């Protein structure tokens, strides 16, 4: 990866709650055990962008998992706005027109540090889901096709399951970012994720950043869980 973040910075905590009050309470409980936060649809549409701006101003990093996908002009202008917000990572769906528009939008903001991530195949999908959606390809084949397109268009990294990380690394090279959701510490409930691995296994597979939600946010002691995951990353 182009930078070398600390083990703590490689953990992205998913703020998948309903209100910014809940999110800020969790952030306070985590303290310095975490420094990177993901904001998705649920919180994003409930004041999450304002929270993102506050977090950035406070020195934290923010991953906006908004999975943009629309006509080119709409995506381009949306990315411009989000780049000005100061977010560190932003997801877009891995469709060529969408990705090209996102790159144009990001590159039009002077000094932007925003990195764009292409969502290849959701980690809640498996081969049966791909067939149901009308694809005559396996998940791994779809991931490879979309990762190659993303690299050629100039996207900075890929969101994929850790099970596809080695395959994606061959495509994006050493400088491409790989971000993996669906991470579950050993013994955790997998929830609605189907292609899950532990933090250590993800790091060993070549993942740059891992995204962890419920195992931290639903824990009785989220700080202790976050610290345990960071230690696992450091030891991997």
From Swiss-Prot:
One of its GO terms (biological process) is 'de novo' pyrimidine nucleobase biosynthetic process. Its EC number is 4.1.1.23. Keywords: Decarboxylase, Lyase, Pyrimidine biosynthesis. InterPro entries: Aldolase_TIM (IPR013785), OMPdecase (IPR014732), OMPdecase_AS (IPR018089), OMPdecase_bac (IPR047596), OMPdeCOase_dom (IPR001754), RibuloseP-bd_barrel (IPR011060). GO terms for molecular function: orotidine-5'-phosphate decarboxylase activity. It catalyses: orotidine 5'-phosphate + H(+) = UMP + CO2. Pfam families: OMPdecase (PF00215). SUPFAM superfamilies: Ribulose-phoshate binding barrel (SSF51366). The active site is at 67 (proton donor). It is an enzyme of class 4 (lyase). Pathway: Pyrimidine metabolism; UMP biosynthesis via de novo pathway; UMP from orotate: step 2/2. Substrate binds at residues 16, 38, 65-74, 123, 184, 193, 213-214. HAMAP family: OMPdecase_type1_B. Catalyzes the decarboxylation of orotidine 5'-monophosphate (OMP) to uridine 5'-monophosphate (UMP). Homodimer. This is Orotidine 5'-phosphate decarboxylase.
């Amino acid at each position: 990866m182009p930078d070398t973040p600390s083990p703590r910075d490689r953990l992205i905590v998913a703020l998948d709650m309903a209100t910014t009050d809940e999110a800020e309470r969790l952030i306070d409980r985590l303290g310095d055990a975490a420094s990177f936060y993901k904001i998705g649809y649920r919180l994003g549409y409930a004041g999450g962008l304002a929270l993102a701006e506050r977090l950035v101003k406070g020195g934290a990093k923010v991953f906006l998992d908004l999975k943009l996908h629309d006509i080119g002009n709409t995506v381009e202008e949306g990315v411009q706005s989000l780049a000005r917000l100061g977010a560190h990572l932003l997801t877009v769906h891995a469709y060529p027109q969408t990705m090209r528009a996102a790159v144009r939008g990001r590159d039009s903001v002077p000094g932007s540090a925003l990195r764009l991530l292409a969502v290849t195949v959701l980690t809640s999908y498996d081969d049966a889901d791909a067939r149901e959606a009308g694809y005559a390809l396996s998940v791994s084949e779809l991931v490879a096709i979309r990762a190659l397109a993303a690299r050629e268009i100039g996207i900075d990294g890929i969101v994929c399951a850790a099970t596809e990380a080695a395959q994606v690394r061959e495509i994006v090279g050493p400088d491409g970012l790989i971000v993996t959701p669906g991470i579950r510490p050993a013994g955790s409930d997998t929830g609605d994720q189907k292609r899950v691995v532990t933090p250590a296994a993800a790091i060993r597979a070549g993942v740059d950043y891992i995204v962890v939600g419920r195992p931290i946010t639903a824990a009785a002691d989220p700080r202790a869980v976050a610290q345990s995951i960071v230690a696992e990353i450091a030891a991997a």
